[in-house]
Amino acid sequence: MKGMRGRLFVMTGASGVGKGTVRAKVLERTRLFYSISMTTRPPRPGEVDGVDYYFVDRPTFEALVREDGFLEYAEYVGHLYGTPRAPVERALSRGEDVLLEIEVQGALQVKRAVPEAVLIFLLPPSLSELKRRLVYRGKDSPEKIQKRLEQAEWEIRNAHLFDYVVVNDVLEEAVADFLAILTAERRRSGRMGEALEMALRRDLALEAELDEILRRRYGGTGH
């Protein structure tokens, strides 16, 4: 809306819960500026710089850290990951709603930096189902899967720190729940200043015509 900042939505959840799949479906169905993360890890096969991540070397990343250029950042498995601040701020200033898809610790950092951010935690149906997804994803060793599950259990136990939770059991239901949250937040009365202002506007020329119709129909002034 004109003159209003956009809203910042943050999707997070355990590794393997399906954040990327839900995010892709959500972006197909509603207008959001998706903020691309930056990382020092090398691209995986099929990944494109500026689409999946901004791939940079460690000195470049660390220089941006010193310049306070990240909303959040963290080191994970030897590589740095972060959300560049400038693209997010530009989009919010234009009145665009922004979506981040980041890890749990990063999401909590964002909430501290931007208290009005809306945090949405994606839950697995169960830890056993999460383990099944991690196994069939085929990317991690048994040791790494166990570590991810331990981390996931800690994250789930802290889900109360987030504004909403969505269970990703049936994909389409999870997407519908996520979209419902976006709709509810967009309709909050505190965020609808321009819409409320427009609803109170009077078109004097139109009302004069209507008053004339009433006068002819009923006589008098039409009031």
From Swiss-Prot:
Gene3D superfamilies: Guanylate Kinase phosphate binding domain (3.30.63.10), P-loop containing nucleotide triphosphate hydrolases (3.40.50.300). InterPro entries: GK/Ca_channel_bsu, Guanylate_kin-like_dom, Guanylate_kinase, Guanylate_kinase_CS, P-loop_NTPase. It is found in: Cytoplasm. Pfam families: Guanylate_kin (PF00625). Its EC number is 2.7.4.8. Signal peptide: none annotated. Keywords: ATP-binding, Cytoplasm, Kinase, Nucleotide-binding, Transferase. PANTHER family: GUANYLATE KINASE, GUANYLATE KINASE-RELATED. HAMAP family: Guanylate_kinase (MF_00328). This is Guanylate kinase.
